[in-house]
Amino acid sequence: MNIQTIMSSFTAQDKDQEVRPSSSGSWACKEVDEFDALSIEYKPKPTEKYPAKLHARNVRKYLDVGEGLIYLPGLPSFNYEDSDMPPAFRQRRYFYYITGVNLSDCIVTYNIHRDQLWLWIPPPNSGRSVIYNGARPTIKEIMSKYDFDHVETLTHLDSYLTWYAHTEPGKIHVLHDYQAPKNIELQITRKNGCHSIISESPFDSSKLEEAMNTARAIKSPYELRMIRKASAITAQGHLNVLRGLRHLSNEAEIEAIFTATCIAKQAKTQAYGVIAGSGENASTLHYMANNEPLKGRQLLCLDAGCEWDCYASDVTRTVPISGEYTEEAEAIYDIVAKMQDECIELLKPGANYRDIHIHAHKVALKGLMDLGLVEGGTFDELFMAGVSVAFFPHGLGHYVGLEVHDVGPGGSRITNRLYGFDKKPADWTDAYFQILSNTGVTSDGGSILEKDMVVTVEPGIYFSRYALEEVYLKSPNYAKYINKDLLQKYYPVGGVRIEDDLLITEDGYENLTTVLKGKEALKIINEGKEQEEEEEREANRKATESRKQKKTWFW
């Protein structure tokens, strides 16, 4: 069976097989009248628009100012260097959050005091531009489709900003200084009656990013529907890979099946590059070459998720390529599955994600000790020495939303600072502190979970030759605890990672990921295996009989 045959069979199979929930968690929160994850059909209300105004008001709440103007430019159009061809368009996510507009060369302003959201668009195009690229949407079309108080062309924006800076109260809030327009007065003189008082810049870049990060961390009902849609299509892509896996010969075919499934479902953009690492390639966390043969390798680590209307999904599954685990691979998979199951059960509002990450390390260490991969001390000694980080070197998870590694409350998207700590507590060893400082997955604002956040839980155990032999085994602090001889048996495992997207609900969590895993995934991989083996035996029997007949005829 070749890849073309596998792909052609998926359409028929999609109609016959549901994408089933993969682990605990209620479906009760899903608005099934508007979105049915099993059919992967999103059914918007007739008058539904992207909730741009709601999102703008959320930002206003966290900006905590009574007046001012939010100014956000969308992505401008541009071509590759030394080329007349543009890259694939990817809208600036902060702009998209308060607009829902996926068009280039637009700007949005939000008057905080007046509660007015305005979109500024390029003038209508004509001539060759329309012939080649189609007509840009008109003001009337945009007003009917999007949630704005007013839409105006960019030709009037400079005048509007100058008017605002001289007559309206409050600063013009921008994300970054370089995004402030350069063609209006940067220094203005405010007047009090007839007297000039102070000369100052109208722009302020100190508050908006933090406010928008905090707003974006809590998903609106519309955003959750988009993430569900992306998750459902992602599930179908993973399912199709499982169906064909035993008949594939190269990592490239795995990537092709996944992306083709997403595109066929109208999800034409991946939230990140597909990671289809087989064998020892699975030990490279962000392996994306996807070009090596599968033959003779134990596991496939497939980390892949599509976008739907700019909202991401992020799912990882690790499965045996042959449909059967080796003893070593199954042992590692069971540890990682236990890490994930226990950590997911700890999710709820008020839970500290940092503590859940620490729990994952404890489960990993216990499993590695049971296998004899780490030894030479008590559990507490090995834990405080940070030995588990040699095998589990990344954070447990991250926010998911408009970015696959989405922003969180307070600070920037990814930080190297430890959540909730400005410095290492005095009684922590450097190695133990490293376990925690690797949790750079939420923001400086802390790691406390809140209702309507979406986070991943993605524990993993890896046998990276480079990490182990060039880093940890060269450090006496780690090497004395690692069983170097036993490592040789586990290098071919490569790595195991399991990742789901979880919605924090009022009293716990809901697993948004419906991709099969564990024994259910093995059933899909091995579907038809017995029949194929019987057909192969029958073909061999007939070939043997044919050879015998020819031999008899010859004599």
UniProtKB/Swiss-Prot annotation:
User: Which SMART domains does the annotation name?
Assistant: AMP_N
Q: Which reaction does it catalyse?
A: Release of any N-terminal amino acid, including proline, that is linked to proline, even from a dipeptide or tripeptide
Q: Which residues bind Mn(2+) 2?
A: D303, D314, E499
- Name the coenzymes or cofactors required: Mn(2+)
Gene3D superfamilies xrefs? Creatinase/methionine aminopeptidase superfamily, Creatinase/prolidase N-terminal domain
Its EC number(s): 3.4.11.9
Comp. bias intervals (Basic and acidic residues): 538-547
Q: What class of enzyme is it?
A: hydrolase
Q: Tell me which PROSITE patterns the record gives.
A: PROLINE_PEPTIDASE (PS00491)
Residues given in the record as Mn(2+) 1 binding sites: D314, E458, E499
Q: Where is this region: Disordered?
A: 527-555
Biological process (GO) annotations held by this record are:
proteolysis
**So which domain of life are we looking at?**
Eukaryota
Any one GO MF annotation of this record: metalloaminopeptidase activity
Q: Name the protein family.
A: Belongs to the peptidase M24B family.
Question: What name goes with this protein?
Answer: Probable Xaa-Pro aminopeptidase BC1G_13431
* Organism whose genome encodes this protein: Botryotinia fuckeliana (strain B05.10) (Noble rot fungus)
